[in-house]
Swiss-Prot record:
<dbReference type="GO" id="GO:0016020">
    <property type="term" value="C:membrane"/>
</dbReference>
<dbReference type="InterPro" id="IPR005296">
    <property type="entry name" value="IBV_3C"/>
</dbReference>
<keyword id="KW-1133">Transmembrane helix</keyword>
<comment type="subunit">
    <text>Homooligomer. Interacts with the M membrane protein in the budding compartment of the host cell, which is located between endoplasmic reticulum and the Golgi complex. The cytoplasmic tails of both proteins are important for this function. Interacts with Nucleoprotein.</text>
</comment>
<feature type="topological domain" description="Intravirion">
    <location>
        <begin position="33"/>
        <end position="107"/>
    </location>
</feature>
<protein>
    <recommendedName>
        <fullName>Envelope small membrane protein</fullName>
    </recommendedName>
</protein>
<keyword id="KW-0472">Membrane</keyword>
<comment type="function">
    <text>Plays a central role in virus morphogenesis and assembly. Acts as a viroporin and self-assembles in host membranes forming pentameric protein-lipid pores that allow ion transport. Also plays a role in the induction of apoptosis.</text>
</comment>
<keyword id="KW-0053">Apoptosis</keyword>
<keyword id="KW-1043">Host membrane</keyword>
<dbReference type="Pfam" id="PF03620">
    <property type="entry name" value="IBV_3C"/>
</dbReference>
<dbReference type="InterPro" id="IPR003873">
    <property type="entry name" value="E_protein_CoV"/>
</dbReference>
<keyword id="KW-1040">Host Golgi apparatus</keyword>
<dbReference type="GO" id="GO:0044178">
    <property type="term" value="C:host cell Golgi membrane"/>
</dbReference>
<dbReference type="GO" id="GO:0140975">
    <property type="term" value="P:disruption of cellular anatomical structure in another organism"/>
</dbReference>
<dbReference type="GO" id="GO:0046760">
    <property type="term" value="P:viral budding from Golgi membrane"/>
</dbReference>
<feature type="topological domain" description="Virion surface">
    <location>
        <begin position="1"/>
        <end position="11"/>
    </location>
</feature>
Amino acid sequence: MMNLVNKSLEENGSFLTAVYIFCAFVALYLLGRALHAFVQAADACCLFWYTWVVVPGAKGTAFVYKHTYGKKLNNPELESVIVNEFPKNGWNNKSPANFQNDGKLHS
């Protein structure tokens, strides 16, 4: 870096070198401002999509599930089958559950 400044001082003189350095700082400042504006715009965009799409979508999905499939899953008979008769260890179950339908035993 000092090599570059020394070379500029030799070729252009101190005034032009100072102008170049000042212009470089102004360019860095403007780049920072542009980056800040971009980040703010991206943040506002993300906040908009989260507020108006993601949250209502999740709430709507939960509402639909609660009032459709959720009601079906709250059936006490189904719950008793799941809790009491469903095989406990999946595919490795050696004694499958026995289900009764009208007094007939089904396995």
